[in-house]
A protein has these predicted regions:
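Mature catalytic core of soluble alpha/beta enzymes
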Residues: 1-202
Length: 202
């Protein structure tokens, strides 16, 4: 899901309740993926990128774009969901030639990157005619937090959600905090430190 894996670990003395909570959480994650994935041609986000305007968007899509624009304003554009043409350019060039794209090509694509051209209204989202957006920098975290809400609604208090290495802990395990090993980037068979999680994320 979302071009990565999700695992949910739950501690509960009620297996049926835990099973229902996990199933509902995964269903919500799948629903979010069907709306926000840039890899699914039938997703709402893909339709927005094709048509440049989307009427009656889902709340998940609207919330994520609004949140992304908030962070774009906060960072003065350092975080920008309209960066997709640049990501696509680098991906294609490395795939075809094994080298970074040429400077002039990058400059041309950079003209499409401007979060201020994204318009969000109550029942409509519009992007520039030459723009493409990606929610890869925000959607996975949103999906995790939505899964946390569902687990809590089932009175689950001890859980760990692993979203492709992004870890979100709910409370602690019966034996204590969740100990998360941070992989050594130079040696995948080793780790560089252990991070204890207690109702937080890394």
């Amino acid at each position: 899901m979302m071009d990565t894996y999700f695992t949910i670990t739950v501690y509960s003395n009620n297996p049926d309740r835990a099973g229902k909570a996990i199933t509902e959480a995964f269903n919500k994650i799948k629903k979010i993926e069907s709306e926000l994935s840039v890899y699914d041609d039938e997703s709402e986000l893909a339709r927005l990128n094709r048509k440049k305007v989307l009427k009656a968007p889902s709340q998940d899509l609207k919330k994520n774009i609004e949140r992304a624009l908030y962070y774009s304003n906060l960072t003065d554009g350092a975080f920008d969901i309209t960066v997709h043409p640049i990501l696509d350019l680098y991906g294609r060039t490395f795939m075809e030639k094994g080298i970074p794209p040429a400077g002039e090509t990058i400059k041309r694509e950079l003209k499409k990157v401007d979060y201020k051209r994204v318009l969000v209204k109550e029942d409509l989202i519009r992007i520039g005619d030459d723009q493409l957006i990606t929610l890869g920098g925000i959607a996975k975290g949103y999906a995790v937090e939505e899964a946390v809400k569902i687990l809590r609604s089932h009175n689950i208090t001890m859980a760990l959600i692993d979203a492709g290495g992004n870890m979100r802990a709910m409370g602690i395990k019966p034996e204590g905090v969740w100990n998360i090993a941070m992989e050594d980037p130079r040696d995948m068979n080793n780790y560089i430190t252990i991070v204890p999680l207690d109702n937080n994320a890394v």
